Amino acid sequence: MAIRKEEESREEQSNSFLLDALYCEEEKWDDEGEEVEENSSLSSSSSPFVVLQQDLFWEDEDLVTLFSKEEEQGLSCLDDVYLSTDRKEAVGWILRVNAHYGFSTLAAVLAITYLDKFICSYSLQRDKPWMLQLVSVACLSLAAKVEETQVPLLLDFQVEETKYVFEAKTIQRMELLILSTLEWKMHLITPISFVDHIIRRLGLKNNAHWDFLNKCHRLLLSVISDSRFVGYLPSVVAAATMMRIIEQVDPFDPLSYQTNLLGVLNLTKEKVKTCYDLILQLPVDRIGLQIQIQSSKKRKSHDSSSSLNSPSCVIDANPFNSDESSNDSWSASSCNPPTSSSSPQQQPPLKKMRGAEENEKKKPILHLPWAIVATP
């Protein structure tokens, strides 16, 4: 036994010697730390907006992919004054709800992109004002499912001064209609795609880069609220937005940075000038600032809470009445909300509310038929 223990101890010592041979001395650790600190200070002291070409070659393929996927939407239908006004109201509601739940800027941009592409591909009737609100709820719900990790219930989306309250099944069927209209392409190229690409190339080395990113997102929230920007390519909107932010951050020498940016994006000043001039005409981005501040506050509050409260106007949602054999489309009279009379001015009937106080805040709940997803 003693001999065996002695052999085991010798084997352990030999193994320890082998492990010791793998270690190396690091006497210059302090010097290396000083060198790294010096290099970081030099990099942070240099201009935060210079994009070095040698750092960008490896991401050129990503940029080419973005350009190949972006498509000119050409939404000329928004030239309609009435539709443009309705869109402004719908976009405002989307931004308010987006901030209410603390969703990201990308979620808001995606929702509005879905909205624009849908309303220009599908004929909405002006005598049914609830249609656009239903589309807005469905677009924001889809965008939240794509971008967010915590998504409210469909009934819970209907907050922030909503005029109508739709049942969950109604919203789901509108989601299906939007998905089929967009050919199930949910990860669309948006201006944020190009802004985030440039920021990723900068590497977010210092606070200036973060500030640049936040300012771009804030301005984009104001830009997408204006229907005049709908027809521009996402890359053009992104370039014009970043050029404007560069001008605000460094008013003394913005031209060189703007030229560098356009060179990276392979865009000419002439192609961006019209969009850039429109941005200059926008008022101070109070909308974007307010929405972004509210969004950040709400995101913090919702991160600490695992449940989302329903709006006070939402009550029991029973399956909406419908005719299974109906093949009517949007334009059919059966799509009208049920009323107690034939008068088109009368609102749909209300379901019973919980509590006496909620009776004072009743909102019309629309019961739409199954034919809501039928294409015209």
Curated annotation (Swiss-Prot):
Provide the record's note on post-translational modification: Phosphorylated.
| Protein's name in the database | Cyclin-D3-1
Q: In which tissues is it expressed?
A: Highly expressed in roots and at lower levels in leaves and flowers. Expressed in vegetative shoot meristem and inflorescence.
Q: Which GO terms describe its cellular component?
A: nucleus
Q: Where is the composition biased (Basic and acidic residues)?
A: 354-363
State the oligomer form and interacting partners.
Interacts with the C-terminal domain of CDKA-1. Interacts with KRP1/ICK1. Interacts with KRP6.
State the source organism's domain of life: Eukaryota
- Region: Disordered; residue ranges are 298-376
Function summary? Involved in the control of the cell cycle at the G1/S (start) transition. Activates the G1/S phase transition in response to cytokinin hormone signal, but declines in response to sucrose starvation leading to G1 arrest. Involved in the induction of mitotic cell division. Plays an important role in the switch from cell proliferation to the final stages of differentiation during plant development. May not be involved in the activation of cell cycle in the root apical meristem (RAM) in the early phase of seed germination.
Q: Which organism is it from?
A: Arabidopsis thaliana
Q: Where is the composition biased (Low complexity)?
A: 321-349
Effect seen on changing S343A: Alteration of the cell cycle regulatory activity
Task: Supply the induction statement.
Answer: By cytokinin. Induction by cytokinin is blocked by auxin, but not by cycloheximide. Induced by sucrose and glucose. Induced by 24-epi-brassinolide. Down-regulated by sucrose starvation.
Question: Known Pfam families for this protein?
Answer: Cyclin_C, Cyclin_N
